[in-house]
Regions:
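Short, basic, alpha-helical segments at the C-terminal edge of helix-turn-helix-like DNA-binding modules
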Residues: 64-71
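Helix-turn-helix
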Residues: 15, 19-61
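An amphipathic alpha-helix signature
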Residues: 60, 94, 136-143, 186
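Amphipathic alpha-helical packing segments from all-alpha helical-bundle domains
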Residues: 71-72, 105-115, 119-149
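N-terminal intrinsically disordered/low-complexity leader segments
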Residues: 1-11
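Hydrophobic/aromatic-rich alpha-helical bundle segments in the mid-to-C-terminal region
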Residues: 5, 127-132, 147-194
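Short alpha-helical scaffolding segments that buttress acidic/His motifs in well-ordered protein cores
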Residues: 97-101, 114, 118, 159-166
Length: 194
């Protein structure tokens, strides 16, 4: 298989996953079928079935893509801060996470898709496992960052839980509540640093 064919295959798979996320975010998880994704992605039904044998495979793939895209955007923003200033503050880090969640909310479907997948994970062991692994990575990464910045008394689990509330407020269009959660995170970090 040539490099061009591999690239084309990857793009087709990415297109299918993007379409699955749009369907989940706009119509709900139970409207996700191979046919609905094929129609949204403008590919043959057999193409969707080729990449994802079952709806569970498609669901887990969509979640993993959502997480990978989030991490890529956050990493790029943090790298940009490091290139400009040599480092970044906790406030800037919190701002990057908050802006990522806000941009998902503005997309019109990504934050809703993440919420739908979270709810559905209670019925799907593989999706629940993927979510647990993503959560562990997040907690470990945030904890290392907090420790490195001198916030050894701050528990990353608490910070991420507040961001879970922030995301929930965004899903329910409670923008004022979401902004208060960001302030709550920053205040909590400062109090616990002492």
């Amino acid at each position: 298989m040539s490099v061009k064919d591999k690239s084309k295959k990857r793009l087709s798979r990415e297109n299918i996953l993007d379409s699955a996320l749009r369907i989940i975010g706009t119509n709900g998880i139970y409207s996700l079928t191979h046919r609905s994704v094929a129609k949204e992605a403008k590919v043959a039904h057999s193409t969707v079935s080729y990449y994802f044998r079952t709806i569970d495979d498609l669901t887990v793939g969509a979640f993993k893509k959502l997480i990978a895209d989030d991490e890529a955007v956050s990493d790029a923003q943090l790298l940009n801060l490091v290139e400009k200033k040599g480092t970044f503050s906790i406030e800037e880090f919190v701002g990057v996470i908050a802006s990522g969640l806000k941009s998902k909310h503005k997309s019109g479907y990504l934050l809703q898709a993440e919420y739908e997948l979270f709810v559905y994970s209670s019925r799907n062991k593989e999706l629940a496992e993927a979510m647990r692994n993503a959560r562990k990575r997040d907690v470990n990464g945030v904890q290392k960052l907090l420790d490195r910045k001198g916030y050894k008394n701050v528990d990353a689990e608490i910070i991420l839980s507040i961001f879970g509330e922030f995301a929930r407020d965004l899903v329910h269009n409670n923008l004022k509540g979401a902004e208060l959660k960001v302030k709550k995170v920053l205040n909590l970090i400062e109090k616990l640093k002492k």
